[in-house]
Design a protein with these regions (language model features):
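N-terminal membrane-targeting hydrophobic helices
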Residues: 1-243, 251-254
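Extracytosolic and intramembrane catalytic regions of membrane-associated proteins
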Residues: 244-250, 254-394
Length: 394
């Protein structure tokens, strides 16, 4: 997830951890550690260049610091840094307990949130080096910003603090709405939900308001997770008559603040034909409310209309055929490509490039693109993550 979401979760957890006994003087300390801990796993960006690009960013971001073992190490490091602060040492034992629990939960929240989208994490390394993909949330989710932002604004101790929390969120939400990436009905729903939440929680205490915000956010996330399961089944059923081989993966990404609309990439292995096929389209979970053609977003830069398959909820926009032999040869003989395949989930080879269809529909447009050219030596410091597409390489 984006760092705005991580930070707002850290603020809400801090207000919740303070409880009724927290003082005005303690809030900056609690909020500070909540925000720092909620973002600290992204410290891996600082050392991603120990491996040349693009491999360094692909393999080190969401790398070791996004594992359970890494979180323990970060907790010890952050705890050591805060332990000697006079303001922490002067706390009562109950206050210190809440402070350390806040730090631990905020750290864990980062891994939990990052596990919910199609980018993936590998939390159980080194015991298990496999990637886990939640396929349930877009990396930017304005509904989470709205609820958590309202709580953060109301919980500000002064009018200036409330304005400082509310104004950037309002500008950000309006900017995103103006791009057209969020459909009009979602913009209206967000505005109503934000106003309703602000009205309901206006007279609540800070920690109760934070608890309410976290509860609403949990329900939103649960709704996306549940809809993701429905979307996956709908994709499998719709594509069944089209497929000649084995479906090895279904990649799902919802449109921002629109759980009815999903970007879909299904990967089919056709061993007998010596190829794998990537089926790319848009799905409307409920076509009576939203047609697949109306679900187009920034993720599809081609024509809005696609071939409708199945029961009418899935519109296919691209069918990309890829040679298995070339992919397997690259994995066997090119150590740079083999390192890239420790990240790539939807690999597409076009000309002298390889890129991930999750992030672009052509080479040279985004961070996963890598040129397939002769290089001296192999990339250094390549972590031993599992290959998402090992099922195509066997």
């Amino acid at each position: 997830m984006d760092n705005i979401t991580h930070s707002l979760v850290g603020v809400a957890l801090a207000d919740l951890a303070m409880g009724r006994r927290g003082t005005k003087a303690q809030r900056p300390l609690f909020v500070g550690v909540g925000v720092v801990a909620a973002n600290l796993p992204d410290l891996d960006l600082a050392y991603s260049r120990i491996t040349p690009p693009p491999i360094g960013y692909l393999l080190h971001h969401r790398g070791h610091t996004h594992t359970v073992v890494g979180l323990v190490a970060l907790a010890l490091m952050l705890g050591f840094a805060y332990r000697f602060l006079p303001s922490v040492r002067k706390m009562r034992p109950s206050g210190q307990l809440r402070f350390w629990l806040l730090m631990a939960i905020a750290l864990a929240s980062h891994l939990l949130l990052d596990s919910l989208n199609s980018y993936g994490v590998h939390p159980f390394y080194p015991i298990d080096n496999a990637w886990y993909f939640g396929d349930s949330l877009f990396i930017l989710e304005p509904s989470l910003w709205l609820i958590l932002g309202v709580a953060a604004a109301w919980n500000g101790r002064t009018r200036a603090a409330r304005l400082a929390a509310a104004l950037p969120m309002a500008i950000l939400l309006c900017t995103i709405a103006s791009t057209g990436e969020i459909p009009l009905e979602s913009v209206i729903a967000l505005a109503i939900a934000g106003a309703l939440f602000a009205w309901i929680t206006f007279r609540l205490s800070s920690h109760t308001r934070a608890a309410a915000a976290l509860a609403v956010v949990t329900m939103i996330v649960a709704g996306f997770i549940g809809t993701s399961r429905l979307a996956r089944r709908a994709v499998v059923d719709a594509l069944a008559p089209e497929l000649r081989g084995q479906t090895v993966d279904v990649i799902l990404t919802p449109n921002a603040s629109s759980p009815l609309c999903w970007a879909v990439i299904a990967i089919e292995l056709r061993e007998a034909d010596g190829e794998y096929v990537l089926w790319r389209g848009t799905l409307s979970v409920q076509r009576a409310w939203k047609a697949p053609a109306d679900c187009a977003s920034h993720q599809f830069r081609g024509p809005r209309d696609g071939r409708i398959v199945g029961d009418g909820r899935l519109a296919l926009r691209d069918v990309v055929h890829q040679p298995l032999r070339r992919l397997r040869t690259l994995a066997d003989r090119d150590c740079w490509a083999r390192a890239w395949l420790r990240f790539g989930r939807a690999p597409v080879m076009e000309g002298e490039s390889i890129f991930d269809l999750r992030f672009s529909d052509r080479p040279g447009r985004e961070f996963s693109d890598m040129r397939l050219i002769a290089r001296e030596g192999c990339p250094p410091n390549v972590p031993n993550w599992g290959m998402p597409r090992a099922d195509l390489l066997r």
